[in-house]
Design a protein with these regions (language model features):
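Short linker/helix segments within small regulatory modules
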Residues: 56-67
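Short, non-ligating residues that shape and space the ligands of small metal-coordination modules
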Residues: 51-55, 78
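Short cysteine-rich clusters marking metal-coordination/redox-active sites
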Residues: 42-46
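Short, flexible, mixed-charge glycine/proline-rich loop motifs
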Residues: 27-40
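Non-catalytic localization and substrate-recognition regions of ubiquitin/SUMO ligases
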Residues: 22-29, 59, 75-80
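Short, charged low-complexity linear segments at domain edges
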Residues: 8-28
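Short metal-binding segments enriched for Cys and/or His
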Residues: 11, 66-81
């Protein structure tokens, strides 16, 4: 059966796995900024955040350290906690 949201699930699982294995940092004292995509690669799943998508920037002390799709941010945040 076709699942129209399967790509979001794949992104989520890929990001969750990368946090669990230490490929993505665990951060303390971060802020989140949400924007329309800048067309850069998502640090979570490795796919480009498309022009029509929202991009979450994770900021630590004024430096953007992660750029993530919304579903990738959720995966990172769940494992981070």
């Amino acid at each position: 059966m076709y699942d129209p949201t399967a790509w979001k699930t794949r992104r989520y699982e890929r990001t969750k796995r990368r946090v669990s294995t230490g490929e993505l940092p665990r951060l303390v004292g971060f802020r989140i900024w949400s924007w329309v995509s800048t067309g850069r690669m998502c640090d979570g799943c490795g796919e480009v955040v498309g022009a029509a998508e929202i991009q979450h920037d994770v900021d630590v002390d004024g430096t953007i350290v992660l750029r993530l799709h919304p579903e990738c941010f959720r995966a990172w945040y769940v494992v981070e906690r």
